[in-house]
Amino acid sequence: MAKEKFERTKPHVNVGTIGHVDHGKTTLTAAITTVLTKKFGGEAKAYDQIDAAPEEKARGITINTAHVEYETANRHYAHVDCPGHADYVKNMITGAAQMDGAILVCSAADGPMPQTREHILLARQVGVPYIIVFLNKCDMVDDAELLELVEMEVRELLSKYDFPGDDTPIVKGSAKLALEGDTGELGEVAIMNLADALDTYIPTPERAVDGAFLMPVEDVFSISGRGTVVTGRVERGIVKVGEEIEIVGIKPTVKTTCTGVEMFRKLLDQGQAGDNVGILLRGTKREDVERGQVLAKPGSITPHTHFTAEVYVLSKDEGGRHTPFFNNYRPQFYFRTTDVTGSIELPKDKEMVMPGDNVSITVKLIAPIAMEEGLRFAIREGGRTVGAGVVAKIIE
């Protein structure tokens, strides 16, 4: 059977299920594919197909993740589901599966549990912009007041972590009933309500090409008679010949002009997100630009040294450290294309961090890096990765 061509007729959105163990994330994932396939076509996935999530590697870290896709009336969704709590932590911190929105699954029978809280906190730290709640197992709760209480608890928890708890859509249902083909309010109807909430509450994400121009510097060459060429892959936006751009990071920010764009030895009038290009810079010396800097639209990104981050520390089995680290630990932080040394300050209540832990830290780098919240990095010691992290808040 020939592979079907991917029809990009509908806007594409990335989502995922989060929540406490055994609250029904995987059952819900199976139910969504089953119900939406009946209505909009596609391929249904059974529970055990999703549960047997294959291993992947992201930044050298092994993560089990299941990927499914489904359609609604006006969108195409890619959806990730992880079997274990540790997989969620790694997935969200490494950005292996960037989410435009998350579906928080919470059992109406149990209410919010420790991982419910932890996943909401992680979503906040790593910059998941929207959360929709699916209150699962509602068929097991006869008391309407109890349901109301659980809903209130979930809303309060969301508000506590700076999500708009009062305005968050909460869909009540039973993933199990929906999966079994029950057409009632808690069954297939609830799944359609959830699909509707996804379509209306999560805005269509900005495409990479529509963002402000940014290109990490990978290499710098000097071409006699023409000037300095910087190569790299455009991360977002478009750069046109003749436009002003800034060189940001490591050293003080300088402005220059793009006088040429080439790809595969051909001259172009612009380079855009996804392109591997060489950019010719006017009046810039070879020694003015180095790996680790970025070329960017003027004013769109600034250099920083001091920030808070959420990090995952690799376990010994993953090739990480064998021993814990303590306050003022000084590893290298690998941002985009280069390492910068920095020191780590642990939270007051944390004396040390063990391999396999995730923790919120404060970092001070010895040189500034073009940075924004949500930027991913690796933590390295002498070239080997010992952790992964994401910038949560910029301090200065």
UniProtKB/Swiss-Prot annotation:
Binding positions for GTP? 19-26, 81-85, 136-139
Region (G5) residue spans: 174-176
Please list where the region (G1) is annotated: 19-26
Q: Reaction(s) catalyzed by this protein?
A: GTP + H2O = GDP + phosphate + H(+)
Residue ranges for the region (G2) are 60-64
Q: What is its EC number?
A: 3.6.5.3
The protein's superkingdom reads: Bacteria
| Keyword Hydrolase (UniProt) | yes
Q: Which GO terms describe its molecular function?
A: GTP binding; GTPase activity; guanosine tetraphosphate binding; translation elongation factor activity
Cite the residue spans of the region called G3.
81-84
Please give the residue ranges the record annotates as the region G4.
136-139
A GO cellular component term found in this entry reads:
cytosol
Assigned keywords, A-Z: Cytoplasm, Elongation factor, GTP-binding, Hydrolase, Magnesium, Metal-binding, Nucleotide-binding, Protein biosynthesis
Localization recorded for this chain is:
Cytoplasm
Primary enzyme class? hydrolase
tr-type G domain residues are 10-206
For the ligand (Mg(2+)), the binding residues are: 26
Q: How does it assemble?
A: Monomer.
Entry similarity comment: Belongs to the TRAFAC class translation factor GTPase superfamily. Classic translation factor GTPase family. EF-Tu/EF-1A subfamily.
Q: What is this protein for, i.e. what is its function?
A: GTP hydrolase that promotes the GTP-dependent binding of aminoacyl-tRNA to the A-site of ribosomes during protein biosynthesis.
Q: What is this protein called?
A: Elongation factor Tu
Gene that this polypeptide is encoded by:
tuf1
